[in-house]
């Protein structure tokens, strides 16, 4: 079959339209670079997914990363179009057994060896107001579990190898409790214990649901997941399917996007053994210091510790003007909120420590393969974007540099962080990270799409979190039009007063740097006004 110029031109127009739609910017031109126009790794997945669904063409993600312009992407699509027939056949997510993924194996074996290992669970709590039927909920939960094999998966370990298996008969774990009239503080205290109760990983399901009745018209809905079977991205898929199932609607069409997790895990091991390990090690050696001690970033307020004690948290709802300023700056800088806010953190760390090269810990969604974009499972990996920070330069220039480091980290973030770190530094002990660092992440509150139909309102209910890893961990969370800063730490490492001072300086720096991105950062970040970050 031959193609004519008209076919290729149609593809170019469609590809450009997809980019404009995802970027929400009709001014985008074919010669523009996707990332220069505000694109990021998450938005790139939307582009790739729509190209595959609407044009029937699967573009290799790493090739997409290297395209100089949207026109180059269109050329890739046009070149691949003749071979696209049949590529969108759905991949079954049926019963399977096989070796666990690299992250799953590392986490399971590490937890068996280390009784102090983090629990590795996450949760979502929602306040549901209006008529809410728990029998319909249970039926919907089981319908979703039937669709996603990971929700029926358990694990075993033998001879240093972890294996996963799907139990075809596993049912959703739903409990209903009546806490009407109980004070809110007591309910939250109970829930904080409930969400941290560990799972028996040898028995499915490794997730549970709790409905807490607060009065006749209101309940709290709690989901708890073992990280072994899901990540934050998975939660969005889960609540979208659950919302449809509860309403009795058809579940979203995920053909070609929900391959079996065990297949992905097998492919990951093959890639590691076929040379990807050295590719990643070479890249990260070029980014990180040869001395692993320099990786463990310690802010001036770090106390040093022989052990971790007194987990603590700080939550700060930012002024609406700060949230608006960030959105405006993102449009001006042609960058995402994640990139812009990470740039602010890097500038502040450079000011606090005097370092000219800053490494932060963050998370990569690791969903570059469109065949698994809607698979529930643990895909996310830790990465370490590293950037030269010159405070005499402008914030605009720093954002550009941070964007490049984020893209590099995303393209080289397809294997678990500990595997990569031990490849670079073989002397590191196996198991969970023991050294401190500074972690930062910006994202929407996961699970925001949950809905149960007309007459029922759903809102997020925030529980006080506990730190479970060394270092200072910060999230900037978008919920609607607002922003919430959350910081987790151990008091044995950082005093609450220091963390509060650092957070206040971060908010102040966010306002100053996004408000005047073309002034030298050294003129905006007066050391006297930011003395709190120096301890």
Q: What residue ranges belong to the model's regions?
A:
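Regions immediately C-terminal to embedded phosphopantetheine-bearing carrier domains
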Residues: 1-114, 118, 139, 143, ...
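Low-complexity/IDR signal
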Residues: 15, 100-101, 137, 148, ...
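Gly/Ser/Thr-rich phosphate-binding loops and adjoining beta-strand/alpha-helix segments
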Residues: 29, 117-138, 187, 201-223, ...
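Extended, hydrophobic beta-loop-alpha segments that form or line the acyl/peptidyl-thioester binding
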Residues: 58-62, 148, 152, 239-240, ...
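Short amphipathic alpha-helices and their capping loops
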Residues: 79-115, 138-183, 205, 240, ...
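His-Asp-centered acyl/peptidyl-transfer active-site segments
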Residues: 115-121, 149-150, 217-218, 271-280, ...
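A short, small/polar-residue-rich loop/turn motif at beta-strand boundaries
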Residues: 130-146, 162-203, 281, 321-327, ...
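Active-site-proximal acidic secondary-structure segment that organizes catalysis
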Residues: 177, 210-263, 495-512
């Amino acid at each position: 079959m031959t193609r004519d110029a008209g076919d290729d031109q149609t593809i170019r127009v469609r590809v450009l339209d997809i980019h404009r739609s995802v970027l929400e910017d009709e001014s985008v031109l074919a010669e523009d670079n996707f990332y220069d126009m505000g694109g990021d790794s998450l938005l790139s997945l939307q582009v790739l997914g729509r190209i595959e669904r609407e044009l029937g063409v699967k573009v290799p993600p790493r090739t997409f990363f290297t395209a100089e312009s949207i026109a180059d992407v269109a050329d890739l699509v046009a070149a691949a179009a003749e071979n696209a027939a049949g590529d969108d056949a759905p991949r079954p997510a049926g019963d399977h057994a096989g070796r666990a993924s690299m992250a799953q194996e590392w986490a399971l074996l590490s937890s068996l060896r280390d009784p102090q290992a983090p629990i590795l669970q996450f949760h979502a709590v929602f306040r549901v107001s209006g008529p809410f039927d728990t029998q319909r909920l249970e039926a919907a939960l089981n319908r979703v579990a039937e669709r996603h094999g990971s929700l029926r998966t358990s694990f075993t370990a033998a001879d240093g190898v972890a294996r996963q298996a799907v139990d075809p008969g596993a049912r959703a774990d739903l409990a209903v409790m009546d806490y009407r009239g109980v004070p809110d503080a007591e309910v939250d205290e109970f829930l904080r214990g409930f969400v941290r109760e560990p799972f028996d990983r040898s028995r499915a399901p490794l997730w549970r649901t709790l409905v807490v009745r607060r009065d006749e018209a209101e309940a709290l809905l709690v989901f708890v997941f073992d990280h072994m079977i899901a990540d934050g991205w998975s939660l969005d898929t889960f609540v979208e399917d659950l919302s449809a199932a509860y309403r009795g609607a058809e579940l979203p069409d995920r053909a070609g996007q929900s391959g079996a997790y065990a297949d992905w895990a097998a492919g990951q091991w093959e890639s590691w053994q076929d040379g990807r390990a050295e590719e990643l090690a070479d890249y990260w050696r070029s980014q990180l210091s040869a001395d692993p001690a320099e990786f463990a970033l310690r802010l001036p307020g770090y106390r040093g510790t022989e052990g971790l004690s007194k987990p603590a948290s700080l939550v700060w709802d930012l002024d609406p003007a700060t949230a608006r300023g960030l959105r405006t700056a993102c449009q001006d800088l042609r960058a995402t909120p994640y990139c812009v806010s990470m740039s602010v953190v890097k500038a502040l760390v450079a000011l606090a420590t005097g370092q000219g090269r800053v490494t932060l810990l963050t998370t990569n969604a690791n969903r570059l393969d469109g065949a698994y974009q809607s698979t529930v499972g643990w895909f996310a990996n830790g990465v370490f974007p590293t950037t030269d920070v010159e405070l005499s330069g402008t914030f605009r220039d720093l954002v550009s540099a941070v964007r490049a480091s984020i893209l590099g980290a995303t393209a080289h973030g397809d294997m678990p962080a500990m595997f990569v770190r031990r490849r670079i530094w073989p002397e590191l002990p196996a198991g969970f990270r023991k050294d401190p660092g500074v972690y930062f992440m910006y994202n929407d509150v996961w699970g925001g799409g949950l809905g149960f139909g007309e007459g029922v309102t759903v809102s997020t209910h925030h529980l006080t979190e506990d730190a479970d890893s060394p270092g200072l961990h910060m999230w900037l969370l978008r919920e609607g039009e607002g922003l919430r800063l959350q910081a987790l730490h151990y008091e044995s490492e950082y005093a609450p007063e220091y963390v509060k001072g650092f957070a206040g300086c971060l908010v102040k720096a966010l306002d100053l740097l996004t408000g005047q991105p073309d002034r030298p950062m050294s003129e905006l970040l007066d050391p006297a006004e930011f003395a709190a970050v120096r301890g």
